[in-house]
Regions:
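Positively charged, solvent-exposed patches that mediate nucleic-acid binding
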Residues: 1-152
């Protein structure tokens, strides 16, 4: 099946794939929330790397149909915002869904695009993000805490 022309792609290089990538983004603890979405951000390893996206849609949100609908809507919104250069480069983002209500129709798609763009701009513009980014790149950033040994 051929791709539609003019459609922005979503290659592997635009996705967070490994659990380590997700852990690094969550460990920095920089987030912004709006409506049903929470966006976590972390500077990428390379400042010239395009923005990458990871999705977290819990089974608490609904059944597989609802979760996959959210994922499709978020991936497409990210593709559109990224194609317009609406996201700051050199950052990794994780979107967490908090609500099961998926915005419907074309108006809903535009609403999700605006939310993603707004959240990304807000979290990157917050005071201390640049300092945390520099510390994280030097390895002095927040490290995941080791779990104490479990007692039996």
């Amino acid at each position: 099946m051929a791709r539609a022309t003019g459609r922005a792609g979503f290659p592997r290089t635009a996705r967070l794939l490994s659990p380590g990538d997700f852990a690094r983004v969550f460990a920095l603890r920089r987030s912004a929330a709006s409506g049903p979405l929470v966006l976590y951000a972390c500077p990428a390893v390379s400042a010239v790397q395009p923005a990458r996206l990871g999705l977290s849609v819990s089974s608490r949100i609904g059944n597989a149909v609802v979760r996959n609908r959210w994922k499709r809507r978020l991936r497409e919104a990210f593709r559109q915002v990224r194609a317009r250069a609406g996201l700051p480069q050199g950052n990794d983002f994780v979107l967490v869904v908090r609500s099961a209500a998926v915005p419907a129709g074309a108006a809903g798609a535009r609403q999700v695009e605006e939310m993603i763009c707004d959240l990304a701009t807000r979290v990157v513009a917050r005071p201390g993000y640049a300092a945390a980014a520099a510390a994280a790149k030097q390895g002095a950033g927040p490290q995941p805490t080791a779990q104490p040994p479990r007692r039996r």
